[in-house]
Amino acid sequence: MFLAQEIIRKKRNAEVLSTEEIQFFVNGITNNTVSEGQIAAFGMAVYFNDMNMDERIALTTAMRDSGTVLDWKSLDLNGPIIDKHSTGGVGDVISLMLGPMAAACGGYVPMISGRGLGHTGGTLDKFDAIPGYNTEPDSALFRKVVKEAGVAIIGQTGDLVPADKRFYSIRDNTATVESISLITASILSKKLAAGLDALAMDVKVGTGAFMPTYELSEELARSITAVANGAGTKTTALLTDMNQVLASCAGNAVEVKEAVDFMTGAYRNPRLYEVTMGLCAEMLVLGGIASNEAEARVKLNAVLDNGKAAEIFGRMVSGLGGPADFVENYSKYLPDSQIIRPVYADRAGFASAMDTRELGLAVVTLGGGRRKPGDVLDYSVGLSKVCALGDEINADKPIAFIHAQSEGAFAEAEAAVKKAIHIGDTKPDKTPEIYRYIRESDL
C-alpha cells in the first residue's frame, strides 16, 4: 500500500519512482482517491525533476490501461493496426489522406483524433464540416467502419484513457503542460489505447509548432520513440517543417476540399505530398506491409493514381453518416463563406519568412478555431491559396485568399496575414519538408 503524498515527496526530492508507485498514483487519478491538489503537486514535481525512460514508460502504460484498451483480434483483420499522430500545426490535413492511403495498401487505421485549440487546427473539426459525419460513433459502428473501410477517424470516447482527461485539465490550469515526460505520456497513452501495432509520429518544428525550438522538438521525438517502443508499439518519429502553412490552405472546409483534391489527383501541394508520403511509408514499413521506404512509396503512389485511396475515404465518410457521393460532389456539401477575396502584399519581392502561428490565429479570429474549449466554429472560414516560402510576390500574385463572413472579419484577417508573411528582396534557401527520422535504432 502506498501513500500519494509519499510518492509526491519522492519525486519532489528527485528520486526515481517504481512502476508500482506510478500505477498506484494513476489509479488514484482515475478513481478520484487522489485529490486535485495532489495531482497538481505531482505534475509540478515531475515538471522540475523529470522522469527517466522507465518512469515514462510506466506512466504511459498506466494511463493507457486506466480505461478501455481496444482489441481488434476478434475482427480477424488481415493486416496490421497502424496509425499516425501529429503534434499539430497549421494546414496539417495529412490524416485525411494518410488514413485512406494506408488502408488502401492493406493496413487498418483506427484513428482517434482531437479538436483544434489555440493556433493549431483539429482533425475532428475538419470532419465536422462534412454534413452527417459522426465523429462520436458507438464502439460497434467504429469497429464496423474500421473493418469494412479499413479506416475510421473519430474522437476520443469516454472510456478511453480517463486518467489523461483528469490529469491534462489540471496540468492546463497549473502551468505544467510543457513537461516532455508528461507530454509523452499524454500523447502516447491516448494513441496506444487504440491497440496499435505500429505508429508514425509527426513532430513539428518551426514557427507553427507546439514546441518552441528544434532542440525541444527533437527531445520530444526521441522521448516518444523510446517510450512507445518500450511500451510494445513499433514507432518512428519524423521531425517535419512547420515554418510555413503545410497545405495551401488553413481552416476546416477549405482543408477538406484540398484533401479530396489530393486523393483524386486534382491538385497535390508538393510539400504536403512529401510529408504525407514520408509518414505513410514509415507506417507501411513498421506494419510489415512494405519491406522498405521505396517499396512503400510505390504502393502509396499506386493507390493514389488508381483512385483506391479516394474510394476508401468516400466509404469511410458514408459509413460514418456522411453523404455517399461526397468525393464526387464535395462542393455541394461543404459550406462557403460570404466573402472570398485575395490579400496582396504591400511590396513586391519573395515570400521570405512566415509566422505560421499567427496565420493559425488569423483562422481562429475568423471563427474557424477555438479560443477556449466549447467554442462553436464556423467551418466555412479560413485561408486558401497561401503562398509558399520562395514564391515571387507582386501586384498580380496575392499572398493568400481569405474566406470571411463579414467585411470587419476580412479586414482583421487581412492585417494579420500581411503581418505574418514577410516579403524580402532575395529568395530564401529551401528548407527540407522532413528534417530527420528518429527510429528505435537511433536511440
From Swiss-Prot:
Main EC class the enzyme belongs to: transferase
Record pathway: Pyrimidine metabolism; dTMP biosynthesis via salvage pathway; dTMP from thymine: step 1/2
Alphabetical UniProt keywords: Glycosyltransferase, Transferase
One cellular component (GO) term of this entry: cytosol
Molecular function, one GO term: 1,4-alpha-oligoglucan phosphorylase activity
Description of how the protein assembles with itself and partners: Homodimer.
Record-stated family: Belongs to the thymidine/pyrimidine-nucleoside phosphorylase family.
Full protein name: Thymidine phosphorylase
Record organism: Shewanella halifaxensis (strain HAW-EB4)
